[in-house]
UniProtKB/Swiss-Prot annotation:
Mn(2+) 2 binds at D15, D75, H97, D149. This is Probable manganese-dependent inorganic pyrophosphatase. It holds the Pfam family DHH. PANTHER family: BNIP - RELATED, MANGANESE-DEPENDENT INORGANIC PYROPHOSPHATASE-RELATED. Belongs to the PPase class C family. InterPro entries: DDH_dom, DHH_sf, DHHA2, DHHA2_dom_sf, Mn-dep_inorganic_PyrPase. The keyword Metal-binding applies. It comes from Listeria monocytogenes serovar 1/2a (strain ATCC BAA-679 / EGD-e). GO terms for molecular function: inorganic diphosphate phosphatase activity; manganese ion binding.
């Protein structure tokens, strides 16, 4: 039997890690030889989740073609967000909830993408469709992913399907959604011990009308906890622009209590962000009122503005 590795995007978040583990458990129950791995360091929120449910973190890998010939992707499809040697392996399956871009295969594959708030919402359907029982531990991981991606149902990406899935998973995991959810989000929002690199850990690269754009996001309970370190943050953003040849680096600092954000933008195309949101950046900083979702409120808006 051919072994498969399953993983989410680089700079993994809670959905990416928990989806990879959950997908692997589903496929193992069906007899597959599969292992969940990760493409980067865990953030503090995900570390809290794995510790809470006593789950070992997936193994960290830099490449995959040296181990397997087939892989499955969760929570992403764009090549620049995936493993560096993705072109050297066959993608046999994708389960995702993002736009489809910069993705093609030479062979047929299982591809499932739905416009929901979280990948594990889709995975819960797959468990049920295949009549595979969701364990208490996996239910906890899947619930955590939904809470994370929907900001405890406050994000505009959240759908009724996500809410229903979360209720079902909470029953299996035997946790109270509100109390556990706030504890989890606050664990991720504590930036007091984070390095500057860790502040920018949740970053994704996009191609927008032939422009290289990187968008990082962090959830906090007080944006000043990050803005007080703005000089260090901007220095690292500038270095990333040089190292990766970026046209724009946007850092979205989201207050999970007010559901507003502040943006820091650096690069030759910062005017695009100003046009997209009708704001003016002063010393690289501007308010982004009501913006909490990179997927729904940042990527599509910037993509459309770059295309003008």
């Amino acid at each position: 039997m051919t072994k498969t590795l399953v993983f989410g995007h680089k700079n993994p978040d809670t959905d990416t890690i928990c989806s990879a583990i959950s997908y692997a458990e589903l496929k193992k129950a069906q007899g597959a030889d599969i292992e969940a791995v990760r493409l980067g360091e865990l953030n503090s929120e995900t570390a809290f989740v794995l510790d809470y449910f006593q789950v070992t973190a997936p193994r960290l890998v830099q490449t995959v073609a040296n181990e397997v010939s087939e892989v499955a992707l969760v929570d992403h499809n764009e090549r620049q967000q995936s493993v560096d040697d993705i072109d050297d392996v066959t993608v046999t399956a994708v389960v995702d909830h993002h736009r489809i871009a910069n993705f093609e295969t030479s062979d047929p594959l299982y591809y499932r993408a739905e416009p929901v708030g979280c990948t594990t919402t889709i995975l819960l359907k797959m468990f049920r469709e295949n009549e595979v029982e969701v364990s208490k531990t996996v239910a906890g991981l899947m619930l955590s992913a939904i809470i994370s991606d929907t900001l405890l149902f406050q994000s505009p990406t959240c759908t009724e399907e996500d809410k229903v899935a979360a209720q079902k998973l909470a029953q299996i995991a035997d946790v109270d959604i509100q109390s556990y959810g706030m504890e989890m989000l606050k664990a991720g929002a504590d930036v007091s011990k984070k390095t500057v690199a860790e502040l920018l850990l949740d970053a994704k690269e996009f191609n927008m009308n032939d422009n290289k754009v990187e968008i990082a996001q962090i959830n906090v309970v007080d944006v000043n906890d990050v803005l007080s370190r703005r000089a260090e943050v901007e220095a690292l953003m500038t270095q990333n622009i040089v190292d990766k040849g970026l046209d724009l680096y946007l850092f979205v600092i989201t207050n999970i209590l007010t559901n507003d954000s502040v943006g820091i933008a650096i690069g030759s195309k910062t005017a695009v962000v100003e046009e997209a949101y009708g704001v003016k950046f002063v010393e690289n900083q501007a308010p982004l009122k009501g913006v909490v979702s990179r997927k729904k409120q940042v990527v599509p808006i910037l993509t459309d503005t770059f295309a003008k």
